[in-house]
């Protein structure tokens, strides 16, 4: 059983330290055990130089086998067959070291490809990089799959299409066929064999495919009733908008002004939202400073009074905003959900001079 690296808090006893130094000096066990031993000694406070003087393992070699042993442990924990583990111990520390840039789930299948294709460290390095680049693509290319072999085959196919030199193109085609895992990927590469003498054609670019990662990036369109002073009938007559999934499609049947708002929680909770505009010095609690316009979001569905909210009420046919300690006699037109000030720009001229903007 290959030993597990100890935690940084673990301290070797003098007897354990001597035993590890002696085992490494005589290179007992496999390279995996050497890597675990070097890591245990380093975690116990022994420098790489001291380990070199005691065992003959140079600093660079210590680093490689320590990292490779960690890769081996992650592969072993994936439940792979024993023959693959035996291949890794073969020794293949240089091969496993190149797989360090992959995730734990990728390392096991990458090691299987290394075993099946008899890859050396340079081939393993190319495989790992191809897998990383393939994973960054916005979508899986046509005819290829997520298998690591197809990832290398895709890189070879793409490079071969751009090569004019016949020898280079032939070499890349052979490489792609060697690694292609799926039948569709192999067919894609074999198509290049039918016309080796022609100039490479430019492949169609990938679609600019994106997906929203955060709900707050999706704006919500809210109908606008107007600015105060405003007739109550005007506020109530603005038709509500219906948004259709999955892209919040809005169909406006009448001439209605709209304003976009972020998908904040208090905006999303509105059952029948409408926007009005007002001035900071005319709010129920005036805001100090220079007067400026504000956007006020009302929910016309919320007409039940509570003493924790501000409301818009009908005052002789006009919209009036206020807070009420008790239920008002006037008709409640809607609850105030949001009062938003405009974005503050310190120096608008700076926006027109890119060289003055901060990095």
UniProtKB/Swiss-Prot annotation:
It is found in: Cytoplasm. Keywords: Carbon dioxide fixation, Chaperone, Cytoplasm, Photosynthesis. Residues 12-195 are annotated as: N-terminal alpha-helix. Disulfide bonds: none annotated. Its main location: cytoplasm. Signal peptide: none annotated. The keyword Cytoplasm applies. GO terms for biological process: carbon fixation; photosynthesis; ribulose bisphosphate carboxylase complex assembly. One of its GO terms (cellular component) is cytoplasm. Residues 219-345 are annotated as: C-terminal beta-sheet. The keyword Cytoplasm applies. HAMAP family: Raf1. Belongs to the RAF family. A major RuBisCO chaperone. Acts after GroEL-GroES chaperonin to fold and/or assemble the large subunit of RuBisCO (ccbL, rbcL). Cooperates with RbcX in RbcL folding, plays the major role in assembly of dimers into RbcL(8)-Raf1(8) intermediate complexes. RbcS replaces Raf1, leading to holoenzyme formation. Has 3 domains, the N-terminal alpha-helical domain, an extended flexible linker and the C-terminal beta-sheet domain. The 2 C-terminal beta-sheet domains are swapped and pack against each other to form the dimer interface. Homodimer. Forms an RbcL(8)-Raf1(8) complex. Forms complexes of many stoichiometries with RbcL with and without RbcS. RbcX and Raf1 can bind simultaneously to RbcL. This is RuBisCO accumulation factor 1. The gene is raf1.
């Amino acid at each position: 059983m290959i030993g597990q690296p100890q935690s940084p808090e673990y301290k070797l006893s003098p007897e354990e330290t001597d035993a590890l130094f002696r085992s490494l000096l005589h290179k007992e066990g496999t390279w995996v055990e050497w890597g675990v031993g070097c890591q245990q000694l380093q975690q116990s406070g022994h420098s790489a130089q001291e380990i070199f003087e005691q065992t003959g393992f140079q600093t660079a070699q210590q680093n490689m086998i320590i990292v490779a042993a960690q890769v081996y442990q992650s592969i072993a924990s994936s439940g792979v067959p024993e023959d693959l583990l035996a291949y890794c111990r073969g020794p293949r520390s240089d091969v496993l070291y190149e797989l360090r840039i992959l995730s734990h789930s990728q390392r096991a299948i990458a090691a299987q490809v290394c075993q099946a294709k008899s890859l050396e460290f340079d081939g393993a390095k190319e495989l790992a990089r191809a897998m990383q680049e393939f994973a960054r693509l916005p979508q899986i290319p046509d005819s290829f799959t997520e298998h690591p072999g197809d990832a290398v085959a895709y890189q070879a196919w793409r490079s071969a299409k751009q090569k004019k030199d016949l020898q280079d193109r032939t070499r890349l085609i052979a490489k792609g066929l060697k690694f292609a895992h799926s039948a569709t990927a192999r067919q894609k590469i074999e198509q290049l064999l039918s016309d080796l003498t022609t100039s490479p054609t430019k492949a169609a670019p990938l679609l600019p495919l994106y997906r929203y990662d955060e709900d707050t990036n999706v704006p919500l369109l809210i109908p606008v009733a107007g600015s105060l002073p405003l007739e109550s009938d005007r506020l109530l007559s603005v038709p509500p908008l219906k948004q259709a999934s999955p892209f919040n499609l809005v169909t406006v049947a009448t001439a209605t002004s709209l304003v976009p708002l972020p998908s904040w929680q208090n905006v999303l909770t509105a059952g029948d939202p409408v926007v009005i505009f007002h001035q900071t010095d005319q709010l129920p609690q005036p805001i100090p400073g220079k007067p400026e316009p504000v956007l006020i979001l009302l929910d016309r569905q919320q007409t039940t009074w509570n003493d924790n909210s501000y409301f818009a009420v009908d005052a002789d046919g006009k919209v009036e905003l206020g807070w009420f300690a008790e239920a008002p006699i006037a008709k409640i037109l809607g609850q105030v959900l949001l009062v938003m000030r405009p974005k503050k720009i310190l120096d608008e001229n700076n926006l027109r001079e890119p060289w003055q903007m901060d990095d």
